[in-house]
């Protein structure tokens, strides 16, 4: 299947509208309801220092990359049953691709 090439600006709009209530992306950003996402790519689930993850997130044991995020963002509660993330997901592949493109640029 593969992750569609995303548009960073469209992804930023999605992040602001759907994610920023609970997440930050900048280096040293505070955890909110959800963890700060800086350094997300290449990190295992449940590993942002200082955030209280559910056992389900800690036990999932996958590494975040384009493919794992693409699947997770479609339906987070299906991908990690027991996660406390209340977001229902992004059903449209192009929206997930846009968001992933933004996250890749914003969380380095």
Curated annotation (Swiss-Prot):
Cellular compartment(s): Mitochondrion intermembrane space
Post-translational modification (record): Binds 1 heme c group covalently per subunit.
Keywords annotated in UniProt: Electron transport, Heme, Iron, Metal-binding, Mitochondrion, Respiratory chain, Transport
Record-level GO cellular component terms: mitochondrial intermembrane space
Binding-site positions, heme c: 19, 22-23, 85
GO molecular function per UniProt: electron transfer activity; heme binding; metal ion binding
Pfam families: Cytochrom_C
Predominant location category: mitochondrion
Task of the protein: Electron carrier protein. The oxidized form of the cytochrome c heme group can accept an electron from the heme group of the cytochrome c1 subunit of cytochrome reductase. Cytochrome c then transfers this electron to the cytochrome oxidase complex, the final protein carrier in the mitochondrial electron-transport chain.
Alphabetical list of PANTHER family matching this protein: CYTOCHROME C (PTHR11961)
Family classification: Belongs to the cytochrome c family.
Official protein name in the record: Cytochrome c
Source species of the chain: Sarcophaga peregrina (Flesh fly)
């Amino acid at each position: 299947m593969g992750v569609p090439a995303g548009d960073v600006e469209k992804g930023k709009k999605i992040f602001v509208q759907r994610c920023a209530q609970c997440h930050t992306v900048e280096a040293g950003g505070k955890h909110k309801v959800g963890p700060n996402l800086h350094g997300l790519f290449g990190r295992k689930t449940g590993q942002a220092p200082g955030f209280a993850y559910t056992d389900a997130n800690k036990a999932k044991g996958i590494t975040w990359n384009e493919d794992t995020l693409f699947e997770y963002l479609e339906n987070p509660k299906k991908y990690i049953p027991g996660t406390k993330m209340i977001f229902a997901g992004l059903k449209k592949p192009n929206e997930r691709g846009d968001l992933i493109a933004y996250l890749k640029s914003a969380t380095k």
